[in-house]
């Protein structure tokens, strides 16, 4: 870290906290689009849950790499007041707003590209957004992550069907997207294999944690 500071003439004191603070940081992200001003805003909130050795946590310097795509898959230029911006957002405060100008139409955000930081990400992606990222994102991690979230959505939906005694089904749109991956697998066989791999059991179970806690609390009240 010291060498990086000297080479780039920057203060990385906050970044050093990664080496002394335990636990996995979480990023809660929401967005808004203003059609009148063609402005897109990302609101990012960071937190790190208390751990046995550290109940009090401090804000970290979290590099959040992003990309924005329009509905046709064209990558948007990141700019603010005519000035080009880096695709890495420096999250250093508990709550921050990042504003992008010249965005014509609500974009699809690819968040945490290249897994730019070891954090948990909470953003309410729609199925349509995930299908778009899987189809045209130029970042391999973003495509793989979109596929994992799509699989999780489908698995959760079918668990609900099973609980209600209904038949299993897979969204035709998801099948079409996966078929597209297969049709173009020769471009990157290793990536295609990863994209078509279902989430691990523990990762899928983790996605149910909030739901199970809510159900347990409701049962206790009864």
Task: Label every PLM stretch briefly.
Residues 1-40, 156-179:
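Amphipathic alpha-helical substructures
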Residues 6, 16, 20, 51-56, ...:
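Short, well-ordered helical secondary-structure segments
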Residues 217-222:
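A short, hydrophobic C-terminal helix/tail in secreted or cell-surface proteins
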């Amino acid at each position: 870290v010291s060498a990086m500071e000297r080479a780039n003439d920057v203060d990385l004191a906050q970044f050093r906290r990664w080496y002394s603070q335990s636990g996995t940081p979480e990023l809660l992200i929401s967005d808004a689009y203003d059609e009148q001003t063609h402005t897109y805003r990302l609101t990012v909130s960071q937190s790190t849950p208390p751990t046995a050795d550290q109940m009090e946590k401090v804000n970290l310097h979290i590099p959040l790499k992003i990309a924005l795509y329009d509905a046709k898959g064209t990558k948007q230029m990141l700019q603010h007041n005519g000035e080009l911006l880096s695709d890495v957002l420096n999250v250093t405060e508990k709550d921050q707003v990042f504003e992008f100008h010249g965005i014509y139409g609500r974009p699809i955000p690819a968040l945490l590209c290249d897994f730019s930081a070891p954090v948990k990400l909470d953003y309410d992606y729609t199925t349509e957004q995930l299908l778009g990222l899987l189809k045209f994102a130029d970042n391999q991690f973003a495509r793989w992550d979109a596929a994992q979230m799509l699989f999780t959505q489908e698995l959760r939906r079918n668990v609900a069907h099973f609980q209600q005694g209904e038949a299993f089904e897979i969204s035709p749109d998801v099948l079409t997207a996966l078929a597209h991956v297969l049709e173009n697998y020769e471009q990157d066989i290793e990536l295609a294999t990863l994209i078509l791999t279902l989430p691990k059991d523990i990762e899928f179970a983790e996605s149910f944690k909030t739901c199970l806690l809510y159900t347990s609390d409701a049962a206790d009240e009864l």
